[in-house]
Amino acid sequence: MEWKDCHVERADWLLTPAQRGNPASRVDRRHADGAAWSTGNDVRPLVHGAVYFAELLAAVRAQRAGDMLMFTDWRGDPDELLDGPESAIGDVLCDAARRGVVVKGLVWRSHLDRFQFSEQENYHLGEEIEEAGGECLLDMRVRPGGSHHQKFVVLRHPGRPERDLAFVGGIDLCHSRRDDAAHQGDPLAQPIADAYGSRPPWHDIQLAVRGPAVGDVEATFRERWTDPAPLSRSPRSRLRATLRGEDTRADPLPVQQPDPDPRGPHTVQILRTYPNRLRGYPFAPDGERSIARAYTKSLRRARQLIYLEDQYLWSESAVQPFAQALADHPGLRMIAVLPPLPDQEGRISTPMNLLGRIRALEVLRRAGGDRVAVYSLENHAGTPVYVHAKVCVIDDVWAAVGSDNVNRRSWTHDSELSCAVLDETRDSREPMDPGGLGDGARVFARELRLSLNLEHLDRDGDKEAAALCEPGRAFAAYVDSAAALDAWHDGGRQGPRPSGRLRTYHPPRLSHLTRALTDPLYRVIADPDGRPRSLRRHGAY
């Protein structure tokens, strides 16, 4: 196919307003052209928490009186350092509020701490912000057993819209997240499974978004902020809030500023998950599953390579669109990079966390055989890396980064936020149209994939990157690198360590009895279903 023939049609890859399936949301209705996406954005991937935190710190410190800072979080640790001494996130947000920045936060009011969630940490972060003049609400407006898992920050600057910025992805403002490419871990670490050590290496991604899409991310925040429902219907939580003197009523927000002007070549579609609840959200009465729908649609165009990094990769239903694509197109390959072990360990939690992945990989392998390659990561000391990234790239055209994992919980049950990105800029390197559908490889998607490939393979330079543009060569490079490192470990780690950080992932075996005993816990606790019954019956989203 000639270079001039490569053109990407947004509606081939992105959801239309009707396909989002949630007419109650403002996110699409606010667009004057009626589109379900915004154009003219500049999006940059921030790989690793240390990179993100440094940019976040600089952006917040540059804000002044009258500016706005809005954030959502799953877990927040006020003492987490963003970039060295005197950069604790709680202090940074409080300093902003004292300068006159309008600081508004929505942090999940977690389940009890004995279940290893984050209630006390989130309470203390919110308390500090409130004392400084900001407002941070602990939000439990979720399904039973659910969570608010969205992780984004919006910075607006009335009179200076060129500074407007949103950060969207999978990185919480908490311990363990400030790691870098060396993967030595965050000095302020949250304990997880022993195999990861006292400073768990942590791999994660966030996007920095500038342009009109900032308004769409802000609209998502405003929908949640203005929800008139009480923050919790639990009598126990409400009593505790009263005794503590917590703020339980959201103050009005300033009027939303016009969207920032176009400033780049990226089309961005904001994707969300909200569950179906007994008392529905006013902005999603039956829930929203646009993340699941977006994956289902985009995977139908996959022809050469699906590149995925994910914390879980659970659930037969969630991997079915991947499996269908693999079955339909015998030349399609899939690479998945996952954590080697669950973050929690125990007689109940370990098999509960493994069962969904084992079943998902069985479905994928039946569909794709050895065209499905699954890996974990280790640092150069041999310590496993906890993969918390949530990123997918399809044929170097469509890319998505967000808070969502590939599992039933993220696609139906918790609140999630993701950005799908299509770049107007074609990539000139061969193959120029890897999918063969006329879309043409796109700079953003290809560069995102290559940056991750190069890091995991311990390679750099334009020549190495150009070689990995070809999907088959990238797939083979992962196979060869992991095989060499596996053999070095199996041989007693004699001689120089091979380059690379990839290890072949071998799913553990669970007995039939363990599977049977674990299945109810997995379905109810680990990976519940938040869809309406009618969609469950039809296996649809």
Please give the residue ranges for each predicted region.
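Charged, low-complexity intrinsically disordered terminal segments
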Residues: 1-541
